[in-house]
From Swiss-Prot:
Name the UniProt record assigns to this protein: Tetratricopeptide repeat protein 36
Lineage, top ranks: Eukaryota, Metazoa, Ecdysozoa, Nematoda, Chromadorea
TPR repeats: 43-76, 77-110, 115-148
Keyword Amino-acid biosynthesis: no
Gene3D superfamilies linked: Tetratricopeptide repeat domain (1.25.40.10)
Family: Belongs to the TTC36 family.
Length: 179
């Protein structure tokens, strides 16, 4: 069994260019969405139904259900975020970006929804070849605690990629006994 200190040391060895968790920020505790709207409960229920539809690859019906959830409560950032994911599954990145922008506008700055929306938007930007926008959104998600975003930040950093490659080569040589 490893301690949190052991994991922190290993993380620093394996990801030397990433900040340590004791860099003054500590662990990020994300808030849940706080939506003050009479339709929020029904919207959340419709959203759960839409997620089930999407998980069964019934994406078109899922998008319709997410849209219904948004109509019931247009202030629900999670519904926009989840519909964006469905749009991505449908290969509609522009619609996904519109929903992600709206989700981020509505979400609190330190919410799980904001973190997820930043990661999704960064992924779209990266696929579109806009590494600057991708880097900015991955950085925002990394600050909110996304380990995936942290890995992507390293991947987008050419110096980190070079360091990781050299480190992998050193470990491989040590393992095989080559000098």
């Amino acid at each position: 069994m490893t301690t949190s200190h052991d994991r922190a040391v290993l993380n620093q060895i394996l990801n030397p260019l990433m900040p340590t968790s004791d860099s003054g920020m500590g662990e990020v505790h994300l808030e849940s969405d706080k939506v003050d709207h009479p339709g929020y409960t029904l919207s959340s229920q419709l959203e759960r139904e839409a997620v089930r539809l999407a998980e069964s690859m019934n994406v078109t019906d899922a998008i319709e259900k997410f849209t219904e959830a948004i109509q019931v409560c247009p202030l629900n950032p999670s519904a926009y975020n989840n519909r964006a994911q469905a749009y991505r599954l449908q290969n509609s990145p522009e619609k996904a970006l519109e929903d992600l922008n709206e989700s981020l506008r509505l979400a609190g700055p330190k919410t799980k929804t904001a973190c997820q929306a930043y990661v999704q938007r960064a992924s779209i930007y990266r696929l579109q070849g806009d590494d600057e926008k991708a880097r900015a959104d991955f950085a925002a998600a990394a600050e909110l605690g996304s380990s995936f975003a942290k890995m992507q930040m390293v991947a987008l950093n050419p110096y980190a990629a070079m360091c990781n490659k050299m480190l992998a080569e050193v470990f491989e040589k040590a393992k095989t006994g080559d000098n």
